[in-house]
């Protein structure tokens, strides 16, 4: 199952929300009405910020047979302290890309109007208080050089499931960077091999 918020944010006039279980559960409810779906082999995979949303949903939705977070993420505001917030604030007017990511895109996606509300809203995107509720086999990716993968190891260590795997992707093998975009075939090979073994496909 592949879910995302990109188009819905633009055409659906909705906003980014952390409670992704309220999105995934109705989708699984529907999937289970389809006779071609194997009810015991539903997989939830999250890419990019989906590496937060998929684990969040899996903490509440226990009909998922396997979980993939690419890359694994942790609490969005975990690295934010007063010094970091002040530094970001001072850079917003001189760093065009940072301004685009936070002010133009971030404010819009979260439906906020100021930096304080942006950081407050981002603090709702966290897994530390619910990660212990994830029950299914889980694969976490950790691509070298991916700026949003800094929480992958924390997520992996906090998981309390017997079948968990942390998969590294390196610049040397051409699979570093955000979501292994230049080596998705290698990503697919490693993930599908794990799924085949985990779910006896």
Say what each PLM segment does.
Residues 14-37, 56:
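Alpha/beta-hydrolase active-site loop
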Residues 36-48:
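Alpha/beta-hydrolase fold nucleophile elbow
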Residues 45, 51-62, 67-69:
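Short glycine-enriched nucleophile-adjacent loop
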Residues 84-130:
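Mobile cap/lid helix-loop segments that gate and shape the active-site cleft of serine hydrolases
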Residues 134-135, 140-142:
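Short beta-strand/loop motif that positions the catalytic acidic residue
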Residues 146-152:
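Conserved alpha/beta-hydrolase "acid-adjacent" motif
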Residues 159-177:
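Catalytic histidine neighborhood in serine/cysteine hydrolases
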Residues 180-201:
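Catalytic active-site module of serine/aspartate enzymes centered on a nucleophile-bearing elbow/loop
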